[in-house]
């Protein structure tokens, strides 16, 4: 038997009975990409309004007696609802679905069926898989390329069918029904039980599917195909939005246009040209800045070399600069006896460092300097450089170098 969410995708709440409630765990994505394990319960109901993940469609969210349902998964002919609080078997409960999420999934899923059918009918482009994403959805087509003309024709056709208000119906067929052989589909799960659900867009397509769908294409409102991207080997990914997602996309795009108009001081039609001019100007500034930085590095190297303080340990810190700046100084000086300790970046924050000098000394001191500055680095042939997180500890690193030089001098 199909769940209530499949029999009536527009139902938003209903009353049912708890069949069982057992301890369970749920692995979720936490901040920083780490996994978090929640302890809770798997609640099984006599029937459910909440769709369990399947057919490329994510699961629903909702509540059971105002207790949040964090995940819904199918197990054979039943659905497991994960909650953090238990519910008593045999008790009657009120189930509500997160309608905004549900209707969005209905629009994207029915939109996928429509695009898949039209792409096949017009150009023989077969769908091999699809993904209902959080912001956009992707249909994988069995073709190495799809032309802009084909995309435009598919988009025009699907939107005409939406305007034609074609009905969408759901039927259940038995496994031995001969009609099953003529229905589009990618096979059934190994643990499938009961009749086969067939979703039909009148005059366009019939497809085996377990998901929730609109009852009429007019509920899709509009479909926008954003374009295609190269997919897996000999495949193309077609990216699309349906229904309310198109409106949200237009709102974001309009907001970006308004912001760019204000920043660039020009009309929408001139945005691209204005950005190109800014990019060219920035490249020229970067080139000029690099030349000046190189000249400064050469001048700095000569100043250090001719300084009365030359010898032993020579240090220099500049807030502005990069690894190239430090390497130019080291190359110009070419010190084989003096330890040269260069740093660039925020004096109390993060930055870069370079240690140059006698190969044996640098090999010994480089990792220790990195440790003092709470950074990482690598080196060879008398040069060690890396990133530091605590430039505020430069004085400690300098003291370490001075102690080493003093010890070496005393031994000589």
UniProtKB/Swiss-Prot annotation:
Major location (coarse): cytoplasm
An annotated GO cellular component: cytoplasm
Superkingdom field: Eukaryota
Assigned keywords, A-Z: Cytoplasm, Metal-binding, Phosphoprotein, Protein biosynthesis, Zinc
Cofactor comment text: Binds 1 zinc ion per subunit.
Positions contributing to Zn(2+) binding: 109, 113, 209, 213
Annotated Pfam families: tRNA_SAD
GO function terms (MF aspect): alanine-tRNA ligase activity; aminoacyl-tRNA deacylase activity; ATP binding; metal ion binding; nucleic acid binding; Ser-tRNA(Ala) deacylase activity
SUPFAM superfamilies: ThrRS/AlaRS common domain (SSF55186), Translation proteins (SSF50447)
UniProt cross-references to Gene3D superfamilies, sorted A to Z: 2.40.30.130, Threonyl-trna Synthetase, Chain A, domain 2 (3.30.980.10)
BP term (GO), one: regulation of translational fidelity
Cofactors required: Zn(2+)
Similarity comment: Belongs to the class-II aminoacyl-tRNA synthetase family. Alax-L subfamily.
Identification of the protein by name: Alanyl-tRNA editing protein Aarsd1
Organism in which the protein naturally occurs: Mus musculus
Gene transcribed to yield this protein: Aarsd1
